Design a protein with these regions (language model features):
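Post-signal-peptide N-terminal segment of Sec-exported extracytoplasmic proteins
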Residues: 39-81
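Surface-exposed short loop/turn segments
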Residues: 72-114, 122
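A short, structured loop/turn motif at beta-sheet edges
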Residues: 51-57, 109-117
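C-terminal partner/receptor-binding element of secreted or periplasmic proteins
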Residues: 118-154
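Sec-dependent bacterial lipoprotein signal peptides
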Residues: 1-24
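Extracytoplasmic/secreted envelope proteins and their assembly/folding machinery
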Residues: 55-63, 106, 131-135, 139
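Bacterial Sec signal peptide processing site at the extreme N-terminus
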Residues: 18-39
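Acidic/histidine-rich, surface-exposed loop or edge segments in extracytoplasmic proteins
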Residues: 36-46, 115-122
């Protein structure tokens, strides 16, 4: 009987940890009240890199990653993600916001040629570990974050 209880306890811990593997706590401060405030008061006026991937694929990869690993994972509040794809402009925008609507981040994905994408991440000044977050978003745009990019890139 005792082994049965131990097995059930271990099984429950395993299930709970596997269900929450991707849902790490997302920092909800600092934040800014509007998109314009965020862009005007962002780390380095936006962190930017070029990636060797089509912008549509990068956008879809980020959309998947944000949906799996950013949305609803705040320390004390919910985090909401939103996105907008503008194919006529060959660009996509992804946002993370607090439950009250304040902006946590803005990510731009823009085509700069065949299979070339400019990724720009806007984080509020004072955001801790901005470079680490930027590298993680670049990895996610490439579809290389196994925790958050469940499907393989197109």
């Amino acid at each position: 009987m005792n082994k049965h209880i131990q097995f059930r306890a271990i099984f429950c811990v395993f299930i709970a940890s596997s269900l929450s593997a991707c849902q790490s706590q997302f920092v909800t401060t600092p934040n800014l009240p509007t998109e314009a405030n965020l862009v005007a008061n962002s780390v380095n006026n936006g962190l930017e890199t070029e990636l060797n991937i089509d912008y549509l694929v990068a956008f879809k990869n980020l959309k998947m990653a944000y949906g799996r690993c950013v949305a609803f994972t705040g320390e004390h509040d919910f985090v909401f993600t939103d996105n907008k794809l503008e194919q006529d402009l060959e660009m996509g925008t992804l946002f993370a916001r607090t439950e009250g609507g304040a902006y946590l981040s803005k990510t731009l994905v823009e085509s700069i040629g065949k299979n070339k994408t400019r990724l720009t991440l806007f984080l509020p000044t004072g955001y801790k570990s901005a470079q680490a977050r930027f590298k993680l978003d670049a990895k996610r745009a490439l579809g290389q974050d196994p925790s958050c990019n469940a499907a393989k890139p197109i």
